[in-house]
């Protein structure tokens, strides 16, 4: 049928030339291409969104997790100033200030911290699970605290952790394990205390030359405390070093220590995964909803590209750095007379 149609078409045409294409018009609209500037076209349509509403909104009806003056570390460890975050509902994304003041109240560091933040970009809810109850450590003192983490003027400590110290001038080997039967991966955090001198070491743990050993089917980590003189931070010359791991389903994590162990009381079951992220912002949640959020504000558009901010969460156009992006159609506007 197609062959017959073409034959009929050609037999119906009179003249010595057939032109198939757009009809040139008198448009003066020009665009810049990768190879050439000021190319004249018949039509150009803007396909780049440049605006936002300046607000932090719920994403598809789900509010973000507002950390306020707390950092990621302060939230997960349980800084006493972050008590409102001890139990949090599902979040769409996380709002963290550039320099939150409530992080590690007891000075130190958090190993692989950026990797932990990257993990949070695919998590939308944690369920706290008590894995090593405080009262299981019957041969050790579990009320260790510091004025650096004070509550109402009294020494305190990270709510989700247990600082094990000597009991009745004795520190026997501390052993504890947890088998993950939760049905999901679990985030486990622990710490090692690094005293300022040997006197502090003996006062807290009786023993010297101590170790902290942590093991799973994929992890074998043994740490020894580093006793050293350091500048004081929050009034302390000693430090705490925190580490984390993901415990797979049905795997077991085991702790063994002769001193300096900061044991986890709680683990964090990853109860819901999904696209999330951490928005670095000084803003607060407003009464609005969106499908696409950036740290600068929400985007509401049907255009395929935007240049608002490289970090987006939700159903968003593709980010480009360009200041202008258009879709050009039609032939170059150069009218020509054909005989």
Swiss-Prot record:
The keyword Flavoprotein does not apply. It is a single-pass type I membrane protein. In natural infection, inactive HA is matured into HA1 and HA2 outside the cell by one or more trypsin-like, arginine-specific endoprotease secreted by the bronchial epithelial cells. One identified protease that may be involved in this process is secreted in lungs by club cells. Keywords: Clathrin- and caveolin-independent endocytosis of virus by host, Clathrin-mediated endocytosis of virus by host, Disulfide bond, Fusion of virus membrane with host endosomal membrane, Fusion of virus membrane with host membrane, Glycoprotein, Hemagglutinin, Host cell membrane, Host membrane, Host-virus interaction, Lipoprotein, Membrane, Palmitate, Signal, Viral attachment to host cell, Viral envelope protein, Viral penetration into host cytoplasm, Virion, Virus endocytosis by host, Virus entry into host cell. It is found in: Virion membrane; Host apical cell membrane. GO terms for biological process: clathrin-dependent endocytosis of virus by host cell; fusion of virus membrane with host endosome membrane; fusion of virus membrane with host plasma membrane; virion attachment to host cell. Major glycoprotein, comprises over 80% of the envelope proteins present in virus particle. The extent of infection into host organism is determined by HA. Influenza viruses bud from the apical surface of polarized epithelial cells (e.g. bronchial epithelial cells) into lumen of lungs and are therefore usually pneumotropic. The reason is that HA is cleaved by tryptase clara which is restricted to lungs. However, HAs of H5 and H7 pantropic avian viruses subtypes can be cleaved by furin and subtilisin-type enzymes, allowing the virus to grow in other organs than lungs. Binds to sialic acid-containing receptors on the cell surface, bringing about the attachment of the virus particle to the cell. This attachment induces virion internalization of about two third of the virus particles through clathrin-dependent endocytosis and about one third through a clathrin- and caveolin-independent pathway. Plays a major role in the determination of host range restriction and virulence. Class I viral fusion protein. This is Hemagglutinin.
